[in-house]
Curated annotation (Swiss-Prot):
Residues 515-723 form the SEC7 domain. This is PH and SEC7 domain-containing protein 3. It is found in: Cell membrane; Cell projection, Ruffle membrane; Postsynaptic density. Ubiquitously expressed, with highest levels in liver. Present in brain, with highest levels in olfactory bulb, cortex, hippocampal pyramidal cell layer and cerebellar granule cell layer (at protein level).
């Protein structure tokens, strides 16, 4: 096509252009043609421009402003140099320039001018003469009834020109336009330039107008229609009115027009905040817009719009009456907010919105008559090359941020409106969100959960309110696809749901097909903001071409089944997973709790379905809990276990609604039983056990303000006390070898049933049994339990002397009834008698006079045991070894408890082995010794008054005894470590002899056995060994 190489044609100026306008236009021209690789800045239009990414194609260029005289029109329309001809049958065509208001207004601001085309072989003199002639009518037009509401430039003398005579004298030879139109200069250099955006498809806009029938009187009679641009209701176009007016009486000042449009945009933005974007405010309520795209007529009557498919392309829209429909501009659907403004004789066209819709393609349009006389037809055809470009997400983000920052500073010029392309913002944000999505299923069961389509996934985080608002305003999102003619359509519902599908055409009818169909095929994915809910379902539904673009009509027309948030799919999946968990189908017992205790909707569904396999009808609460815990291992974090128990409580209440008043009451008792089980049978509780009365007292007032039945609480307490709660373990753990578990001997096998020494009566259950620990000393010892935990006296039936073969192995003193054999495992009875020596102190029992060679061992929990040896040397050997082990391996104590009670309590002493080196351990003991000594001195400096209560005196004595004992213990620890520490743990020279004797039976060597003569009990033995007894305390120290 001729003229395709005219893109580099030098810029030609209108004689009346000012120097400032020329400089601005030059900068724009160089920017658009000389530096096309740079980032495209914002548009300068005050109400009809939209921010576009540099790669987005634009079939419908936008218009900006001009400054003085002929540049008064705000034009941002860019015609490519490769565009097809613009014909004027029977008239001479003139070459259009961006700075010519009188000519470009005919295309962009129809009420003022008639479109003209410039032949290539003629000069620009006819244009200058036209502008001069148009200026002559400025005063006459400016004096009309239409007044400016807002003036952009006080020094600019804006007017609209009459071109009927100039058009009649213009050349009638049709020619082709070859020039690319640079952006017209804006009001000030601060306003960003409008980008030249290449289009993808050929767009032919055919306008037929009767120029000879236009009279100034007719246009003058319709001025009131122009001014009354807020008029509502259907508008009927008079038959006598011509589509295009070139009369000076029907024109008005562009400044007045812009000011009115700015005011109108604010009004329309308030009336229809979702129907307008930043570039869609040019349409007036009293304006009729008529544009045909591929055989689809889009008719606008101010705020009324109708999109339809005419039976005949030659039908005239002038005599048609349209139903009332709000006007809007949707960047997603690419609605052309190009307005064909008809007020009697006046038509106003501003083709804008397609620049906002990336990937929109429109074919060449056939001519469509807009007038009835048909004497003169004006055709405007624009041809563009086919371009396909991909979005640059990061580049769009940076461009949008720059645009927002710039436009915030130009609010006084641009007025209210959107400052960025909502489609572009959403595309970048949407890609970012997709990158951060993940599945909510557990990692172990994801591959075995169920086989569903790949489209089932959900957002970890919901869409932000800003993105949701932009989606609702845009209505739909179109993204270019490589598939022929298909586009991604993304719509949002009122609840934040997003539906993506593929459409062979644009849903507002901009396609070759007579009826555009919105297809929801198998590729469609429905996203939901709420976590853990998703579904996809193929569906095909027709879309009303005239529906409001910013609304959610598309989703509202969907059936409720297709918008069920995927609940049905999740329920079915939860049922399948729950069934497999209950039957342990490719799951272990320890895996069940992981799937029931997660904090998401799907896990809750699985737990509810899992509990349906249990029937607790007629069972007591403790029986139901035991039955439930036998099915799986209740492991995991505390909150995960509690979630599982919540589901259990709900299920029990549904099966037994009359037993307990509420679900909360059931859950409260369930947790109370779990805590009671830990208190009575737990490994870490070495203090006083909870009594039944304390259990009842703790549950007062928690049954919805009332109390539970005491009989019920007593029954639950006795049930837990007599039989502790246990849950099932995996078969693999039961079959572990002794090297992996314990040295317990049971029926000749070594199943892992006890991994820690002792039993429920042994306070040192938290000490793991190490079969590989070193043996430091062994031999026969006679044991007598003198005091239980916290110094309480031992019951009378348990105070007798018993002979054991003792083995100091690691930090544990094992007491065996049978002879020692290294290959022999310890029995349950042996483990029950074991004593931990961490933080213990062994000393000679100076207060016990009934038997010789007796030493006393006071443990960390203040148990007191008496041991008798065969000789004084052996007694001292046991004392040294026990103290040395305690000094070397005892870890630093925990800080003292902080509470509101004034009652003294000893700090906890950890049973774990210290991780400090010997030097660090020595420093730790010395530091603790110094602290205890200082505290003891302060304590004794404030003795209790004689008038205080006896309870306070006992508290004082108890603390005094504790501090004194701790001081003595740390003094011995420090002295042991200074003497050598671990070196003292090596075997002495006389030790092998004792070890040899240990392999023989005590009955075969009665001389080596301790003296077992029966001694009459003394009253002093039955005394409490608590420190408050002065006599005992004096003897012990």
């Amino acid at each position: 096509m001729e003229g395709r190489n005219a893109a580099a044609e030098p810029f030609v100026w209108v004689n009346s252009a000012s120097a400032h306008s020329q400089s601005v236009a030059k900068a724009k021209y160089e920017f658009l043609f000389g530096k096309s690789e740079e980032k495209t800045p914002d548009s300068s239009d005050h109400g009809g421009s939209t921010l576009l990414p540099p790669t987005v194609t634009n079939e419908f260029p936008e218009y900006g402003t001009m400054e003085e005289g002929g540049e008064g029109l705000r034009a941002s329309l860019d015609f490519d140099a490769k565009s097809p001809p613009c014909r004027l049958p029977g008239q001479q065509a003139v070459h259009l320039l961006a700075g010519q208001d009188s000519i470009l207004n005919s295309v962009t601001e129809g009420p003022n001018d008639a479109p003209q085309c410039h032949p290539q072989e003629q000069s620009l003199q006819p244009i200058d003469s036209l502008i001069s002639a148009l200026k002559a009518t400025e005063a006459r037009i400016a004096s009309g009834t239409f007044q400016a509401t807002k003036v952009l430039d006080k020094d600019a003398n804006f007017s609209v020109y009459q071109v009927d005579k100039e058009l009649s004298t213009a050349s009638h030879k049709p020619q082709r336009a070859h020039r690319t139109f640079p952006v017209g200069p804006g009001k000030s250099p601060d306003i960003p330039l409008s980008a030249e955006v290449p289009t993808e498809e050929n767009l032919s806009l055919h306008i037929q107008e009767d120029l000879s029938a236009l009279l100034p009187e007719e246009a003058q009679a319709h001025r009131s229609q122009i001014t009354n641009y807020r008029r509502q209701g259907p508008l009927r176009v008079p038959e006598s009115a011509c589509p295009v007016s070139s009369s000076s009486a029907g024109s008005h000042n562009p400044v007045d027009r812009v000011g009115a449009l700015r005011e109108q945009r604010s009004d329309l933005g308030r009336e229809h905040p979702r129907g307008y974007d930043r570039g869609g405010s040019m349409g007036r309520q009293g304006r009729i817009k008529h544009v045909e795209f591929q055989g689809v007529e889009i008719l606008w009557t101010g705020e009324e719009a109708e999109s339809r498919h005419p039976p005949e392309r030659t039908a005239s829209p002038v005599s048609k009456e349209f139903a009332k429909r709000p006007s809007h501009s949707s960047p997603a659907c690419g609605v052309c907010s190009t307005s064909t403004h008809l007020t009697g004789d006046v038509w106003d066209e501003t083709c804008k919105a397609p620049s906002e819709r990336p990937g929109t393609s429109a074919g060449t349009l056939s001519p469509m008559p807009l007038g009835e006389s048909g004497e003169d037809d004006v055709f405007l055809r624009e041809s563009k090359e086919h371009l396909e470009e991909n979005f640059a997400i990061q580049g769009d983000k940076e461009r949008i941020l720059d645009q927002e920052e710039h436009l915030r500073g130009d609010d006084d010029i641009l007025g209210p409106g959107y400052t960025e392309d909502s489609t572009d913002v959403y595309s970048s944000q949407f890609e970012t969100i997709l990158d951060n999505t993940s599945l909510y299923y557990s990692a172990e069961s994801l591959e075995t959960l169920y086989s569903e389509p790949d489209s089932y996934f959900s957002f970890e985080m919901p869409l932000t309110p800003m993105i949701q608002q932009r989606i609702k305003e845009g209505g739909q999102f179109l993204e270019r696809t490589s598939v022929g003619g298909q586009h991604d359509v993304l719509s949002v519902s009122a609840d934040g749901g997003i539906v993506m599908g593929y459409s062979a055409g644009i849903t507002n009818g901009l396609h070759d097909s007579a009826n555009s169909v919105y297809t929801r095929g198998p590729q469609e994915i429905a996203f939901w903001g709420s976590r853990d809910r998703c579904f996809a379902e193929g569906k095909t539904t027709g879309v009303d071409a005239g529906s409001e673009m910013g609304s959610t009509d598309i989703l509202e027309k969907e059936t409720t089944e297709s918008l069920s948030n995927g609940t049905n799919s999740n329920v079915e999946a939860a049922k399948r997973l729950a069934k497999r968990l209950y039957h342990l189908d490719r799951f272990k017992r320890s895996d069940v709790a992981k799937h029931l205790g997660k904090n998401n909707e799907f896990s809750k569904l699985v737990a509810e379905e899992y509990l349906k396999f249990f029937d607790f009808t007629g069972m007591t609460l403790d029986q139901s809990l035991r039955y439930f815990l036998k099915a799986f291992s209740l492991v995991g974090e505390t909150q995960e276990r509690e979630r599982v128990l919540i589901h259990f409580s709900n299920r029990y209440f549904s099966c037994n609604p009359d037993t307990i008043t509420s679900k909360d009451g059931v859950h409260c008792l369930t947790c109370a039983m779990m805590l009671l089980n830990t208190d009575l049978h737990g490994h870490v509780n070495i203090g006083k056990k909870m009594t039944c009365q304390e259990f009842i007292t703790n549950l007062q007032g928690v049954n919805e303000g009332g109390d539970f039945s005491k009989d019920l609480l007593k029954a639950l307490y006795n049930s837990i006390k007599n039989e502790k709660l246990e849950w099932a373990v995996d078969d693999e753990e039961k079959k572990k070898s002794p090297s992996e578990g314990t040295d317990e001997k049971a029926n000749g096998t070594h199943p892992k049933t006890i991994s820690r020494i002792g039993s429920t009566t042994n306070p040192f259950l938290d000490i793991p049994h190490d079969p590989n620990a070193a043996v430091y000393k062994s031999g026969f010892l006679a044991r007598k339990i003198h005091a239980d935990m916290d110094g309480k006296k031992t019951p009378r039936g348990k105070r007798g002397w018993k002979t054991f073969y003792a083995v100091l192995k690691g930090t544990v003193l094992y007491l065996q009834k049978d002879e020692y054999k290294p290959e022999k495992s310890l029995s349950d009875e042996d483990l029950k008698n074991a004593v931990s020596v961490h933080h213990a102190l062994a000393s000679k029992a100076t207060d016990y006079e009934k038997k010789p060679n007796v030493f006393k061992l006071k443990t960390a929990d203040w148990r007191v045991l008496l041991f008798q040896t065969q000789s004084p040397e052996e007694m001292q050997g046991w004392i040294n070894k026990i103290n040395c082990v305690a000094a070397v391996f005892s870890a630093p104590p925990f800080p003292a408890a902080i509470g509101s009670q004034k009652k003294f309590s000893r700090p906890l002493l950890p049973a774990t082995t210290t991780k400090l080196s010997q030097e660090e351990q020595l420093k730790s003991h010395e530091s603790k010794l110094k602290q205890i000594t200082t505290e003891l001195a302060e304590h004794r400096s404030y003795p209790p008054d004689k008038k205080v209560k006896a309870k306070d005196v006992d508290e004082y004595k108890l603390k005094d005894h504790y501090l004194e004992f701790e001081k003595t213990r740390y003094e011995i620890y420090v002295s042991v470590l200074k003497e050598g520490g671990k070196e003292l743990l090596t075997t002495d020279g006389n030790e092998p002899v004792g070890l040899k004797k240990s392999h023989s039976s005590p009955s075969l060597n009665p001389d080596a056995s301790p003296v077992t003569a029966k001694v009459k009990r003394n009253v002093s033995e039955r005394k409490d060994h608590r420190p408050e007894t002065p006599g005992i305390k004096q003897k012990v120290t």
